[in-house]
């Protein structure tokens, strides 16, 4: 609930959630981003972001902006977690908090997780099959894991 309230502008100062007396600066992705849509659906429950949120064109821009702005908050995908910014633990129920990690995403204790899919034209299935087979192979799954994504196998 607190994340929703921050990103919707109901909570505007960190002291409202037990932090320092500092204005919260909200960074989000641009509206064409799948991450923007997912966060809006899952965290904001399809309600609008606060009008003063600062829209960033890429994940790297969010990390850079949050790392350089006191009181800032933003969101990035698990594969893009950076030591330049502090990640926060999140809870389904306000009692049991989980940090963003491969383990918490896999065991579903971290509540903000979405699947990613590959889509291709059926007419190209013969040409795409070797790529799909490689992605699903142990070597492909290892590359996915090393890239910070959760393998399907």
Q: What annotation goes with each model-predicted range?
A:
Residues 1-153:
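Exported/periplasmic ABC-transporter solute-binding proteins
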């Amino acid at each position: 609930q607190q994340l929703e309230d921050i990103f919707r502008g109901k909570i505007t100062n960190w002291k409202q959630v037990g932090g320092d007396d500092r204005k919260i600066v909200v960074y989000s992705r641009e509206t064409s981003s799948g991450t923007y849509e997912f966060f809006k659906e899952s965290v904001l429950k399809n309600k609008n972001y606060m009008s003063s949120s600062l829209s960033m064109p890429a994940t790297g821009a969010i990390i850079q902006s949050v790392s350089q702005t006191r009181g800032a908050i933003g969101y990035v995908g698990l594969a893009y977690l950076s030591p330049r910014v502090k990640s926060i633990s999140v809870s389904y129920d306000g009692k049991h908090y989980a940090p963003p990690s491969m383990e918490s995403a896999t065991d579903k204790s971290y509540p903000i997780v979405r699947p990613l899919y590959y889509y291709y034209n059926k007419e190209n299935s013969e040409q795409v099959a070797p790529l799909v087979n490689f992605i699903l192979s142990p070597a492909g799954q290892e590359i996915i894991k090393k890239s910070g994504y959760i393998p399907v196998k």
